[in-house]
């Protein structure tokens, strides 16, 4: 059977990547995501930028490990924090996050509750530094800011949700910005559903 060349990742010497057509994990692509995060020094950058007020006297999972787990879940397509309970014993997730057991859904929910508005700005700054590193690697010299609004449906009684006449449904109406040349995600700002498309665009366009 033909096999592709094996590659060993740098963040964990016990993991190698190959494809022989045998059994595969549906989330094995996260190994490559983790390798990229390791090359960019994500964990160290997160420690520098993110400072979450935490009054827990005892905990198993620190805030940055929960953040990385949540990011991995979102990248893998698990948008609901409740998926954490199904993934706690997933071998790929445990390997890339270097944890014997992952944080539960309740731990993720409490983590999200701890995030402040200042933490949101810190996450934006972290995102921008990662983009800057990518731009240096690609030797990018031009930037086109593709700025637009979008709609996010809400269900139940969510804070600041409102009716949007254009989409004819309840939800949020956030602003988002991408690099029109590379597709890099530059920035996002959550707004209530009834906000006009261009409201706040001037201040939003000041990137980090």
PLM regions: where:
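Dynamic "connector" segments at or just before major functional cores
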Residues: 1-170, 174-208
């Amino acid at each position: 059977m033909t096999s592709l060349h094996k590659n060993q990742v740098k963040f964990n010497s016990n993991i190698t990547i190959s494809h022989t057509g045998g059994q595969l994990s549906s989330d094995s692509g996260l190994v490559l995501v983790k390798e990229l995060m390791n090359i960019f020094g994500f964990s160290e950058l997160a420690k520098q930028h993110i400072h979450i007020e935490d009054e827990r006297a005892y905990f198993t999972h620190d805030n940055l490990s929960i953040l990385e787990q949540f990011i991995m879940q979102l990248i893998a397509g698990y948008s609901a924090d409740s998926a954490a309970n199904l993934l706690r014993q997933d071998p790929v997730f445990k390997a890339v996050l270097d944890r014997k057991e992952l944080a539960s859904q309740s731990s993720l929910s409490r983590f999200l509750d701890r995030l402040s508005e200042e933490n949101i700005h810190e996450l934006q700054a972290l995102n921008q530094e990662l983009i800057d590193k990518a731009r240096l690697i690609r030797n990018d010299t031009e930037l086109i800011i593709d700025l637009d609004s979008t709609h996010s449906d809400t269900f139940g009684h969510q804070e600041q949700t409102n009716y949007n006449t254009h989409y004819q449904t309840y939800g949020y109406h956030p602003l988002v910005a991408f690099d029109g040349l590379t597709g890099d995600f530059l920035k996002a700002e959550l707004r209530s559903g009834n906000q006009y498309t261009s409201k706040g665009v001037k201040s939003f366009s000041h990137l980090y």
